Amino acid sequence: DDWDDAYANARHAMGNLLPTVTGGFSSTLEAFGFDLSVSASFQLGGKVMDEGYQDLMHVKSRDVGKNWHKDIARAWTPQNQHTDVPRLDAGDSNADATSTRWLVSSDYLSLNNVTLGYTLPRHLVRHAKLASARLYAAADNLALFAARQGIDPRQSQTAVYANSYTAVRTVSFGVKLTF
């Protein structure tokens, strides 16, 4: 029971999965036949366990042959004592144990869509027996700005991020003809 009591008393809340604020914004500008539409979303507050990064920072002997994250090059050595990356020790099974070291902010700003279009003047489209013609280019999931490069905090509903695929970036072009 002493162990259970010590363990229970040693645990502390280190953050919250739930964000403080979520939101989005969009805007459309039109001038001289051109139109530009932008939409974005954001989240402030909340934490996520970056297990993808944790897995790439492994040092255990059973992990031979696995890739490492580039940050492993900053590991502690007698010549590199000013670092936040522990020394490499294949015999230390706790080197990448779950801890607050892997807890990162789930704040993000996502540029969801940008669309740029041009509507041809009526005097040009009338000759083709059209009511209107619009050319456009659109990009979805254009950019994500987050606390750690490579993590997509939009993917986690369980406070754990472990190598999930992020939203696909797409670029499309189109023509809208109205008869």
Model-derived features: where do they sit?
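Outer-envelope beta-barrel architecture signal
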Residues: 21, 32-34, 107, 129-133, ...
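Extracytoplasmic gating/loop element in the C-terminal half of outer-membrane beta-barrel translocons
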Residues: 43-134
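Membrane-embedded beta-strand positions in outer-membrane beta-barrel channels/transporters
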Residues: 24-26, 113-117, 172-174
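C-terminal beta-signal and terminal closure region of outer-membrane beta-barrel proteins
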Residues: 67, 72-78, 142-179
